């Protein structure tokens, strides 16, 4: 008997806009989607949702007394997390700075954006393709999620995967075919394969 799991994850990952056809919002969203090479608006709403949850947590902590153990403990943990992901500088160690964070701060820390800005890809869209086709690794771990949030200490370890043709791995399909036809011509083995691809 095959066991089928009917578990469903009910955790919200994004929140759609309250007013669907607001012109200013539509224009600003489209600009961000184009600038950061996002697949759809849902990817943007997902970032906005995580930002709003972080800001709500900071706002909640700011209402507590400064000497409150919960504010000290949770506030420091939140700031540490923001510093680790490069969203805040080491000098910005107050909860007020968390409230000033924007969606762009988060989008700048995505793997897709960082691969493009580091010059490994020709465009932001090329960067997404490289990541999805498993050409990029962070440290020793191959990462194929464009929305992967890069930590500050991991940023210098972003490189091409060892199995990728860009990282000195096995050459790609077209290059292998060209090398094969070149070796045939060199050995004088008659015509190259007739089934050329366009």
Curated annotation (Swiss-Prot):
Q: Where does the record place the region Disordered?
A: 163-198
Transferase as UniProt keyword: no
Q: Which pairs of Cys residues are joined through disulfide bonds in the record?
A: none
| Gene assigned in the entry | RPS9B
What's an example Gene Ontology biological process for this entry? translation
Coiled coil feature spans: none
Q: What is this protein called?
A: Small ribosomal subunit protein uS4z
How is this protein organized at the quaternary level? Binds to the translation initiation factors TIF3E1.
């Amino acid at each position: 008997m095959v066991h089928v799991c009917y578990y469903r994850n009910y955790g919200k990952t994004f929140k759609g806009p309250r007013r669907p056809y607001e012109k200013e919002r539509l224009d600003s969203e489209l600009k961000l989607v184009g600038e950061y090479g996002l697949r759809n608006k849902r990817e943007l709403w997902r970032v906005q949702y995580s930002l709003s949850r972080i800001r709500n947590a900071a706002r909640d902590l700011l209402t507590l007394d400064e000497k409150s153990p919960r504010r000290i403990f949770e506030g420091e943990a939140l700031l540490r997390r923001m510093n680790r992901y490069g969203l805040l500088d080491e000098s910005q160690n107050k909860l007020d700075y968390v409230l000033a964070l924007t969606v762009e701060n988060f989008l700048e820390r995505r793997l897709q954006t960082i691969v493009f800005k580091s010059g490994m890809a020709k465009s932001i869209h090329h960067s997404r393709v490289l990541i999805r086709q498993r050409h990029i690794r962070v440290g020793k771990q191959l990462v194929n999620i464009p929305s992967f949030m890069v930590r500050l200490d991991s940023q210098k370890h972003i490189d091409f995967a060892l199995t990728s043709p860009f990282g000195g791995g096995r050459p790609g399909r077209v290059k292998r075919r060209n090398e094969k036809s070149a070796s045939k011509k060199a050995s004088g083995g008659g015509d190259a394969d007739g089934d050329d691809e366009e």
